Amino acid sequence: MNRFYLLRFISLLFIANLIFGQTTKLHLVFTNDIHGSIHQIPARFMNPEFGPMMSGGAGAFAYVSELRQEAKQKGDDVLLLDGGNFFQGTPLGTLDGGETIIRWMNQMDYDALTPGLRDFDQGVENLKQLSNVANFPMLSGNLIDDKAGQNPEWLKPIIYKQIGQTKLAIIGLTQDNIPELSFPKNTEGLQFLPAVASAQKQVKTAKLNGADIIIMLAHLGIPYNRKDEFETFLSQVSQGETSVESKGLNAMELAHFVEGIDVLVTGGVAKGYNEPWEDPNTHTLIVQNYGNLSGIGHLELLIDQDTKSISGYEFPTDRGMLITLLQDDILPESEMGETVHHWVKDAKLKAEKQFFSRDTNPKKNAYLKTLKRLSESDRFPVPSLGKPEQLEIVTWNLEWFPAAGDTTLEAAAETIQEWGVDMVALQEIKNINAFAKLMSFLPDHDFVLSKQSSFMDQAIIYRKDVVTFLAQYEPFSFDDYYFAGRPPLMANFIWHYEERQREFMVVNMHLKCCGDGLYRRQKSLEQLHDLLAQYIENGNENIIVVGDWNDQLTDTGLNQSFTAFLDDPDTFQFATMEISGDTSQASYPKWIVPSILDHILYSKGFFDEQALGGKIQTLRMEEVLGSWELYEEILSDHRPVMWTIPIPD
């Protein structure tokens, strides 16, 4: 009798499936913009002072492992993808070119990733080597090997997976304007084909090979304020300003132009959305997670095995598809947690050891071509400021560099060349490729560029004939919330002239503006003071701290950001204190009250030199260019600030 009822029950299930169709579930799990951050840190974005601990890569490992076990029991499938920018951002990622992060991804059992903009930071050969380490494919269908004339052998354009009776294609795409955003050497040997045409070709290929559902893995990004940005895009399309041939399209724009993509997993912007974006034209779903592995994305796709299509989707929580990796909610898997802890500890020690090691061979950037500036003669009467017997350093926030494209590059190159100063510290470098072009106009100079910043870069440009670069380091990159994702760029140098020489450290930083900026500036400077005081105690007394501090020395009480340094006058002094009350010397004259926001601080190792004749001044560049309007249009809204000190025999 029991057997009779069992057979009848099975028959009813079979009939129901025939009538109603069978629906299976595909758990789409995704990450993007990890930036080498698989360690545990406090969630300061929730509570800057007492942030709950996050579980990091070990928490992600625990979540995905448990999900896979549950899915197996229920007959569901799991797909784990990454949208790029996986290793740049911490020494854990950059010291070995991303190999440690790939080893973690192997343990996570990723199905695929697509390389992002910052994944090219150490060149194509490095990515190729990482593909050999990875137990999963790297995907991109629009990258062509210059020599072979086809997809590089280490990249796959498409992979296929079977989900029940449904064939799934995962196609890869890389941002087609990466060569315009990176150092030329970083993408050497590759052609980046137009995104839309490549995507259309891949979709067609996938369909011809029997794919029922197509998931695209594309490093394109969903911007902040996605609704407003999409409306702007539609307006640009209607006016002919944006089309299928446009370069640098974001994920929403590409999905609007390309039919046949069911889901697009993207990265490149560290802004997560709890609900997918659905294109009103193609109905493509687009998903993007927050960056730095603060969470993991999880969308439950419902697959109709009868129609072999996506019939809907569900969220794993009431909040949506983003799972914040809080330790209180998701405990780190113990063995993985211990492994990551040791990786981080070793990376910190190695990074600091390299910074203080003394290599007799000077470091050079040998991968920049020397170009001539477009203008045949100098446009502006830039004064000569450099003298051989003194050390000069300028700090200059070049707002959203380059603000006016090649015009900015020409003006900045002419200025730096004609100044003739030993060092120029820059902030707000938005486009690294443009910075490379700037340096190609300055063959007598070399540079140090930040490696760990997540929102614009800092650089130190120096004259090769008087300054030798030794090493760089970016402290706090494992926990850079207080520094607004821009950890200080530290670099050790030797200044030399005839028989004189002096070893010293330069710290270039760009502190948080606006919002909770005051609190974060205070905390970041407390951290920096304590670190530099430790360096001085260990015998490194020659330190210069420059940059856009985004605050004034004249503030008082609780509104003062610089208290940690001001309360230690026997160790540190502000060169800019001398001009702090002089509005004619304001580095940011646009404020309601013209202000000095760009400062230079020096440590006790330079006290004697300052007393011998140190000078501080703001450089009134609007007088050089002819007007403030022109200066602001092509260079910056900040004036540069220069400090000079004599270096005695």
Named regions from a protein language model:
Residues 388-401:
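An acidic-aromatic substrate-binding cleft motif
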Residues 334, 338, 377, 627-649:
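Surface polyanion/phosphate-binding segment centered on an Asp-His-Pro turn
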Residues 518, 540, 550, 554, ...:
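Active-site rim elements
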Residues 22-346, 352-390, 406-407, 411-417, ...:
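Acidic, metal/ion-coordinating pockets
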Residues 15-16:
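N-terminal signal peptide c-region/cleavage motif recognized by signal peptidases
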Residues 302-304, 603-604, 644-649:
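Short beta-strand-to-coil "C-cap" segments at the C-terminal boundary of structured domains/repeats
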Residues 553, 561-616:
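Acidic, glycine-rich loop-and-strand cores that form catalytic or ligand-binding grooves
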Residues 3-12:
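Sec-dependent signal peptide recognition
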